[in-house]
């Protein structure tokens, strides 16, 4: 298993306190595949350098995961199907 860092930018209309609990159903994808969610860090609302989907700001969330590559690929796919998710970025951490 490898370690990944996933950054998610969510629509700013969502309340920052409800973002982490609503992510739980997506994080179950990792848990069901014998992976682990090491850290969930909600950075809060931040302004963009340029508009993304006609939005000027978004709620940033950073996840640290340990899982297989297929699992993180599926998580990214499912997150991008959600209309509240503006953008995702998956990075594999170096050893």
UniProtKB/Swiss-Prot annotation:
Annotated Gene Ontology cellular component terms: cytoplasm; ribonucleoprotein complex; ribosome
GO annotation, biological process: translation
Keywords tagged on the record: Ribonucleoprotein, Ribosomal protein, RNA-binding, rRNA-binding
Annotated GO MF terms: small ribosomal subunit rRNA binding; structural constituent of ribosome
Source domain of life: Bacteria
Its job: Binds together with bS18 to 16S ribosomal RNA.
Matching HAMAP family: Ribosomal_bS6 (MF_00360)
Homology family: Belongs to the bacterial ribosomal protein bS6 family.
Protein name in the entry: Small ribosomal subunit protein bS6
Organism listed in the record: Corynebacterium urealyticum (strain ATCC 43042 / DSM 7109)
Name of encoding gene: rpsF
